[in-house]
Design a protein with these regions (language model features):
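Long, contiguous internal "core" modules enriched in hydrophobic/ aromatic residues
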Residues: 1-113, 129, 189-192, 203
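Extramembrane terminal tails and long inter-domain/linker segments of multi-pass membrane proteins
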Residues: 78, 143-156, 164-213
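Catalytic-face loop-and-helix region of soluble metabolic enzyme cores
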Residues: 108-120, 169
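Central hydrophobic cores of alpha-helical transmembrane segments
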Residues: 118-128
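Hydrophobic transmembrane alpha-helical segments of multi-pass transport and channel proteins
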Residues: 128-135, 161, 165-169
Length: 213
């Protein structure tokens, strides 16, 4: 679809800052490093614009595809309402849409957007909605119905679920290690540790020289 590249860009610029804001909040709460409010506010403004544009494009696609429904719209129709009594992905679609709409409304309200207790909730809703829309709402319905008109519902297997969770876990582990190292360098903790080790070594060397003398 011609709007697909724009939707990918807008949702990426909405989901990415959501994850960054959540990381900033965790850093501010659990480390000595302080993230300025202006940086978080700028990211929240970017999310508001990009999420609103993504929702507008989604609604436009729904109207265009379903206004004069053809066989090409069966995938979207199945995603929204189901086909032939098969509705496995319908809850995923509507939950994604509700998450993004609720998050967008929260971001539109300045009192919520600048409230750092409510802002993480909006970020989680937006990120979850976009993740569902890009996974269960985009990849899977592309194969439903099949080119010959068959409708076969898809259910993630246990192995697929474990692999997905494992990939996310490895990603968060790498991010945690990198953030700990970067924060340690920026705050001077690693430098102080090296200096302390150097001083200990010099003292040990001096004591050994005195003993030899």
């Amino acid at each position: 679809h011609s709007m697909m590249p724009i939707r990918f860009i807008t949702t990426a610029f909405a989901a990415g800052p959501c994850l960054i804001i959540l990381a900033f909040m965790i850093i501010r709460k659990n480390t000595k490093m302080w993230i300025q409010d202006s940086a978080i506010n700028l990211l929240a403004d970017i999310i508001t614009w990009c999420l609103g544009l993504a929702l507008f494009l989604t609604m436009s696609e729904i109207v265009v595809e379903l206004y004069a429904r053809t066989e090409h719209a069966n995938g979207l129709y199945y995603l929204m309402f189901g086909l032939h009594g098969l509705t496995a992905l319908v809850p995923w679609f509507w939950s994604s849409l509700v998450f993004m709409i609720v998050a967008f409304v929260m971001f539109l309200i300045p009192g919520v957007r600048r409230n750092y207790k409510l802002l993480p909730i909006a970020c989680v809703l937006a990120f979850a909605g976009i993740w569902i829309e890009k996974g269960m709402g985009l990849i899977v319905p592309g194969f439903i119905p099949s080119p010959i008109g068959e409708v076969t519902e898809y259910y993630p297997t246990f192995i697929e679920v474990v692999m997905t969770v494992g990939n996310w876990a490895i990603g968060f582990l790498i991010l945690t290690v990198l953030l700990k190292g970067a924060i340690g360098i920026l705050m001077g903790d690693i430098q102080l540790a090296r200096r302390g080790a150097g001083e200990s070594a010099s003292r040990t060397g001096g004591a050994q020289s005195a003993v030899n003398a």
